[in-house]
Amino acid sequence: MLRALLPSTTLALILAGGGHAAVGDAFPAFAVLCAAWDAATNKQIKPWSEDRELPELNDIYNMNMSIASEEWQTIFDGQAEQQTWSQFAQANAGKYKGIDWKQNWDRWRKQRQQTKDAGGAWQTKNHRPEWAATPRDVRPVILAIAEEATELSRKLEPPRTADGKDLIAEINSKLASARCSGELKAAAGNIGCTGPEGTPDKTTTCTTAKAGGSIGHDMLCLCSVAEATDKCSSTGVGDAVPNSGEKLRSNGFQHIVARCPKGPESGTLPQAIDLALAMLATALGTQQPGSNNMILGKSGGGTCTATNSACVDYHEKFSKQQAGITGIPWVALLQQARALYGTYVDAKLAAQTARQQIVMLAGQAKREYRRPAGSLKDPAGVIQEQATNRRRHGADDTNQCTSNNATADECPETRCEYDSEKNECRPKKGTETTATGPGERTTPADGKANNTVSDSLLIKTSPLWLAFLLF
């Protein structure tokens, strides 16, 4: 299985054994680390590109504002046009005490500014003809569409982990930790490593305890050799070659990593990680015949801490943790990043779907916005409103307990109770339809939606009564 994942030339290099040193002896092991470096460096996740400020979403919000009641619209006129939410709340503390519109305030002000002037750019482009239905008639459907679009727009926000962290930043952080450790520090822009500073001893830097700390660390230890035959490339590593006993060269890492072959530009992060780990699993121990240690590369004298040894000894990581290659710290970090990548892909797909649905909702809203007076509601808009109401109130009928239920047998037991003295079928206590809060609406007995400030039941039941009008 692992062989099938590897290019034939790379596999041949990895499996090449032999007891005699030769130029490029360390290259098979170096190719493994370069593949891991490519995954951790060149496959970082780009910043989230999904734009929550979709023009279609803005149109939905503007339509909702342009047909809102005059009392709601004028809240955002005058001094409010320039005020932050905290300034507005302070200036109107008595009138709006207990209300918090901080999350939506700036957007609402923007919508009012864009729709206030009948001759403005947005109103000119989206002019409602004189024969269109009245704002009061179209508010319920457009409001339902705006609510649905608001819910969908949340899927356009940058994804987060289960504990609330920025998902992309977390993936890239795992990759960064896999790249550098110990004597190597993250480079500017967090795209590589720098170091080592000074000239640390290889004997104390490249111990089995420190092996696997990062991909860069293992590259440094593998390729910092004085022997001419133990090279990570056919041309050597230049100024990274130790030149004083067991001392590593200052800032030698940049000369080592520069010898890595360029990885493929195509492919995903999981594909790059899978290839690197398959190469690692195949290469471990193959160049060290007779050794029970899990060594990557070839030891010159039974150890990987000398400058005549081109290897990394992972024996301690295998023997202590009993976790296979996942006991190697940088391997574990790559696998963690890979696991998070699945959540990232799901979020991208959800955002793409949400964007498409918002575009469709904008089309429905525009048809309703221009619906002729006296005509039937746009079927798509009706379906949208019904779907929203089902989500809000459940699929139950709110008028099950009516005067038509003349007898106890006709009175539904699930939601109603029969009063034998008055011969009435009425809702059970606790099941009556009530206002439920900001963003949710009730329908009065006359069947007309509450669309103005003065007739809204939410005014009487919640300090956030206005918030239901615009989402």
UniProtKB/Swiss-Prot annotation:
Pfam families: VSG_B. The keyword Lipoprotein applies. Residues 455-471 form a propeptide. It is found in: Cell membrane. It comes from the Eukaryota. Glycans are attached at residues 64, 405, 450. A lipid is attached at residue 454 (GPI-anchor amidated serine). It is a lipid-anchor; GPI-anchor. This is Variant surface glycoprotein ILTAT 1.21. It comes from Trypanosoma brucei brucei.
